Amino acid sequence: MWTRKAAFTFTGGIALILIGMMISNHQMMILGLAFIAFIVVNSWVSGHGDVEVQRTLSADNLYKGDDLYVELLVTNRSRRKTQQLEVYDNVPHEMKLRSGLNQMRLNLKPGESARIRYVLRCPLRGHYSVGPVSLRYRNTFNLSVDEMYVDHHSDIIIFPQIRDVEEAFIRSRTAKMYTGATTLRTPGPGTEFYSLREYVPGDPFKNINWKAFARTGELMINEKCRDAVTDLYIILDSRDIARIGTVLKNPLEMGTVAAASLASFFIQRRDSVSLTIYDEKLSFLPPDTGDKQYFKILSSLAGVAPRGTMPLQAVTNSLAARFSRGSPVFIISSCEGDGTVPSAVRDLVGRGHEVTVLSPSSIDFERLVSRIPRMSYEVLKIERQ
């Protein structure tokens, strides 16, 4: 493709030839022919080398707010120079360039390589793709430009942030008959001996090891291993109303952080965790444990988006047969625009489940994007409580 400079040169050459013919000026005609010949010869010798592009990422999976280090290796595989080569690596607009540049002008000799390094900040969770790579070749006199794309994509998943969860002895009221081959070597309520520790005020006297007290003269407590794996169910509200607020602060974002933190805590305890997301449809991930289940949960949370208006009662009715008897249930929802929440919670409690509702206040998030009078805000908070 010709540049503006080449177009003006070609047009000027044609004009000089025509004007020279009209006024019988051979010198002007020769000058016009020189311009045309210059364009033709330049087009004949122009071109570019065979360029190979490789991209390396510091990680394929990151947490929200982390930095992604990107390195782009550009190699000239041909036997000619690339002349003026512009390289631009396309990045998602949700990511911010923290340091370095994702574009560079190069002039590579045959077999020569160059590296482009830059750092991206990942402020939003989701599934993203870095690429493709845009290449623009300019010849020596900047008369022609060739543009092309290298279809090289690098997929990356940004997980929600993980917050610390305080220790909580949450367990199923009904022990599982078959817990598999997982050995639970962590302290908690149970029957199998784990270790001895010093007495702390508030410990039950029935757990005091009197033989150790007679031998050492200090009160020692018998720590027990947790008896069985607990099936834990997390229900996340992803309805359209969960988008209230800003992009970074809204009920859905807070809900994904809470769900990811709970899943991390209980999977580290070697419990089985299930995730249910409801919006316009119902997505159910059966309970399981281990790193594979943890990755499935984080991947599901990374791709969740607000849509739909499914009520909670429909969710609990559909999943009632899949819930293990007496298992804890966490409901993460703003509870706005859904009058079935109280009846759904009562049904779960009636079936013997220990229900915990985590409800981010949509009123506080709405106040970030709209002007709510102070008095109205206080009234809405009282009504919500």
Regions found by a protein language model. Give the residues of each.
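Secondary-structure junction/capping motif
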Residues: 3-4, 250-251, 290, 310-312
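An amphipathic, basic-hydrophobic helix/alpha-beta surface used to engage anionic
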Residues: 27, 35-291, 328-332, 339, ...
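Short low-complexity, flexible loop/linker segments enriched in glycine and/or proline
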Residues: 289-292, 371-373
